Amino acid sequence: PYNFITRKDWQGSLARIYAFVQKEREQYKENLILLDNGDILQGQPTAYYYNYIDTVSPHLCAEMMNYMKYDAGNMGNHDVETGRAVFDRWINTCDFPVLGANIIDTSTGEPHLPPYKVMERDGVKIVILGMITPAIPAWLSENLWKGLRFDDMEETARKWMKIIREKENP
């Protein structure tokens, strides 16, 4: 793990993060929101195993995230790097929505993933909008994401914020 606040490596594992999250849940109860911002499918030997060796079982990363009770996830470029079969299997195993407002299915013109999730905590309506870098085509071979398009994040945010304000009224 990496601490983006201190910009230093963070010694630990998902087990350590789970212990931290459980402690926070004791304090904040149902008001705690647990999100993943992507790239869960790379960097660990266990992820590699379920990405490329055991391609039939439910993906361990999804199983761990389900156990930890994530509220929502987001696609990262390293998740796309594993290829459609792997990341679609991971998404389909998750008990929570994996978001991607700017990941467009080219056959339908619609988002490949749910664009956002609505939650209510302590009487406050919260909307989580998920997006991925649109640089995927410049970074990764098309065979990894064939049938998808990655739209501009700013334009996508404007579009979906209008829809969210009108439809969800957060």
What are these model-derived regions, one by one?
Residues 1-170:
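Acidic, metal/ion-coordinating pockets
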